[in-house]
Amino acid sequence: MNISIISVGKIKEKFLKAAIDEYSKRLSKYCKLNIIEVPDEKTPDNASLKEENIIKEKEGTLILKHIKDNSFVIALDLKGKSIASEEFSDLIENCRLTGNSTIAFVIGGSLGLSEQVLSRANYRLSFSKMTFPHQLFRVMLLEQVYRAFRILCREPYHK
């Protein structure tokens, strides 16, 4: 299975890079992982809604360039569906069983995802109604993908 994580912005903090590297290493036994970073657009203080939408559209265009036609796209979205870890593992397994061996997870920048990206998504997923920094969220997503594979392989993992 091929999994891409397409994310807006670069990870600068060493502790987050270390966690990403650790989960990437752990996931290598279950899937081919590709992490793609697209540049984030600078958001001016007190940006208007129109300015925010333009920024999201620019970031969205960059994101869409990295999504393959055959990808099952899961957009991380505050308005998405919240599911348990077991349901998340079922979602990944259902992709595999229905011939979608390529999954692209998309993490937006500080303003979220553009309508173009949300329209391309096959599934909208929310981890919580809370807002998280998108850099930290990448680590959280990797952990849940790792947990999902452990569940699917019936391997022990802390609860």
Swiss-Prot record:
Domain of life of the organism in this record?
Bacteria
User: Can you name this protein?
Assistant: Ribosomal RNA large subunit methyltransferase H
Organism, by scientific name, is Clostridium botulinum (strain 657 / Type Ba4)
Q: What is its EC number?
A: 2.1.1.177
Entry-linked SUPFAM superfamilies: alpha/beta knot
CDD domains on file: RlmH-like
Task: Name the Gene3D superfamilies on file.
Answer: 3.40.1280.10
Gene Ontology cellular-component annotations: cytoplasm
Q: Which UniProt keywords apply?
A: Cytoplasm, Methyltransferase, rRNA processing, S-adenosyl-L-methionine, Transferase
| Annotated gene | rlmH
In the UniProt record, does the keyword S-adenosyl-L-methionine occur? yes
Family named by the database record: Belongs to the RNA methyltransferase RlmH family.
